[in-house]
């Protein structure tokens, strides 16, 4: 009986020792952290606004939308696909997009509207502001990007 009790105690000690040893080994070498997922595309996410006034800082924002162009066009912009296509065609050059088309006839009234774009375009930080003299000029120069 004494041998049986001793054998059980020895077996228990060996099992307990192996469990503690395995626990010590597991805690000594932590599991490797999962690799951060890298995007295949440079981010393109913008907030676009239209406001009445001559400067964005003092203009009353009338409308604002979000525009995401990667990996697919989305956001609250009513024509996200068209706006993203126009930005890609202009290589993200907002000055090209807001250029008033030649041959446009508008009055010379001063009723300024300002458009802004802020965010990231193809991985590059963007902060753009353009003031149109009046709604006629804005309609002639805003393109799809600021049409909302």
UniProtKB/Swiss-Prot annotation:
Disulfide bonds join 69-84, 106-136. Its main location: secreted. It is found in: Secreted. PROSITE patterns: SSI. Residues 1-38 form the signal peptide. Keywords: Disulfide bond, Protease inhibitor, Secreted, Serine protease inhibitor, Signal. Belongs to the protease inhibitor I16 (SSI) family. Inhibits transglutaminase-activating metalloprotease. This is Transglutaminase-activating metalloprotease inhibitor. The gene is sti.
